[in-house]
Amino acid sequence: MIRRFIDAFDVFFYRLLQESNSKRKGQLFEEHLVDWIFTKEYYDLLHLTQDGYTNFFRYVKSSEYPDFKFQDRISDKKFWVEAKYRTEWLGDFPDQYIYFLTESQLERYKEVDKKLPVFIAVGTGNKAHNPNQIYLIPVRFIKVAYKIYKKHLLPFEIDNAFKFPQEKKHELALPPQSLWERLDP
């Protein structure tokens, strides 16, 4: 009986630590996007979704929106970004995939996309604050929730410091023209 209690206790804390680690990686990737990809040189940050701690005490309805809302400083166009970081790809080449959006998230983001464009930023590999690859795919091109294959993300890859180490990180911000071209591949 005591052994079962200890096992349950171990599983509970293992999952708790695993979830905390996953959330931390997500936060680091979000910081990377704001600091290096969607820089204040090109974009104003209009909205940042509440963290889980705020929602624990009182649920904030706007938490159902994507993580960020930006405004292009050149054209004044507004758009949303949902950030997803995954440490590694699952499956074997050439059919590698990641799990990334639930059905309800995809439905919500497609509704938001009817008013303002929604992009899903997917970071993979290396560290969350400096991923190997970053993909920025308009949600309107995502047909199925839960998992997405690497081969479907490749056309939406953006340059980053890992891919081009000779570049300085501040030179790798995503210019607005490159952002808007993604809507018309």
Show which residues each predicted segment covers.
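Short glycine-/polar-rich loops that comprise or flank the Walker A/P-loop
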Residues: 114-118
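A short acidic/basic microdomain associated with nuclease active sites
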Residues: 35-71
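Acidic carboxylate-rich catalytic motifs and surrounding loops in phosphoryl-/glycosyl-chemistry enzymes
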Residues: 49-52, 120-128
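Mg2+/Mn2+-dependent nuclease catalytic core
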Residues: 86-112
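Conserved catalytic cores of phosphodiester-cleaving nucleases, focusing on short active-site segments
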Residues: 37, 66-91
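N-terminal targeting/trafficking signals and adjacent low-complexity tails
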Residues: 46-50, 85, 93
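Conserved alpha-helical elements of sugar-nucleotide-dependent glycosyltransferases
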Residues: 25-33, 105
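Non-catalytic C-terminal interaction segments of nucleic acid-processing enzymes
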Residues: 1-9, 17, 21, 28, ...
